[in-house]
Curated annotation (Swiss-Prot):
Protein name from the UniProt record: Pantothenate synthetase
Record keywords, A-Z: ATP-binding, Cytoplasm, Ligase, Nucleotide-binding, Pantothenate biosynthesis
Functional description taken from the UniProt entry: Catalyzes the condensation of pantoate with beta-alanine in an ATP-dependent reaction via a pantoyl-adenylate intermediate.
A cellular component annotation (GO) from this entry: cytosol
Documented EC number(s): 6.3.2.1
Gene3D superfamilies hit by this protein: HUPs, Pantoate-beta-alanine ligase, C-terminal domain
Length: 279
């Protein structure tokens, strides 16, 4: 595996490749990330991964400096997965001057759910993804469904900018007890880790109610948040949305069998967890 930080060197190595598959990450890789590499390999060759902790997507009170950096361990994992190039730029490589041009997702996608609680987050995400796409110029890129809103926004960005990159969605990788794998799970205490699967159980309970014909989504959302609060969580949202555009479904949508997804974000102790489940 080649480790490259220079954009021009990366382009030189990839010039002439017909179907490069790309997986962007912020490092601290776990089995969920590695499942993305395997899916990428099914859709393209060579596989390029990136590791870059993107300052632009962290808010002023978020954990940029605290975010775990495990570069050498990440390298070993990627080598075992047969990744061809690890693109590991420095901030100076990607931001040689202040990034004054930013991508701004549309309000109905970018300022709801995560965007409401993390202002500017999706602008930071889409700006770095667009820049990484420019560097790698992939035919396909793999994003996990765990970050469902991010996946939808990147997919829409790629479509609306007519980028020659197909966005592939990977299923959420879960521990045996249902907890979605996340780099932030390492912040959980042993007691919190034992409680953490309750978030996915809550999503399943909501989904089962919808499947059984319960159409009062606001009541379902309120009850699910109240149940988590009673267990010691601090929920930001549990919200049922249309898969197509992440807007709340109307009564007509519900009656006509619109495809839905229920999304959640909640703090357990000091750790904020997100998850979702398609209905």
């Amino acid at each position: 595996m080649k480790i490259i930080s220079c954009i021009e060197e990366l382009r030189d190595h990839l010039r002439g490749q017909l179907r490069t598959a790309f997986v962007p990450t912020m490092g601290n890789l776990h089995d969920g990330h590695l499942s993305l590499m395997r899916l990428a390999r099914k859709h393209g060759d060579p596989v390029v991964a990136s590791i870059f902790v993107n300052r632009l997507q962290f808010g002023p009170n978020e954990d940029f400096d605290r975010y775990p950096r495990t570069f050498q361990a990440d390298v070993e994992k990627l080598e075992k997965e047969g990744v061809y190039i690890l693109f590991a730029p420095t901030e100076k490589d990607l931001y040689p001057e202040p990034q004054e041009f930013r991508v701004q997702p549309p309000n109905d996608l970018g300022n709801t759910l995560e965007g409401e609680f993390r202002p500017g987050f999706f602008s930071g995400v889409t700006t770095i993804v667009l820049k990484l796409f420019s560097c790698v110029q992939p035919s396909v890129a793999v994003f996990g469904k765990k970050d469902y809103q991010q996946l939808m926004i990147v997919r829409n960005m790629s479509k609306q900018f007519a980028l020659p990159t197909e966005i592939i969605a990977a299923e959420t990788y879960r521990a045996e007890d249902g907890l979605a794998l996340s780099s932030r799970n390492m912040y959980l205490s042993a007691e919190e880790r034992a409680e953490a699967p309750a978030l996915f159980k809550s999503l399943n309970a909501v989904a089962n109610e919808v499947r059984s014909g319960h159409l009062d989504i606001f009541q379902l959302e309120r009850q699910a948040m109240a149940d988590l609060s009673q267990r010691g969580w601090k929920p930001d949202y549990i919200s049922i949305r249309k898969r197509s555009n992440l807007q709340p479904p109307s009564a007509g949508d519900m009656a006509q069998g619109e495809k839905l997804v229920v999304l959640a974000a909640a703090k357990l102790g000091a750790t904020r967890l997100i998850d979702n489940l398609e209905i």
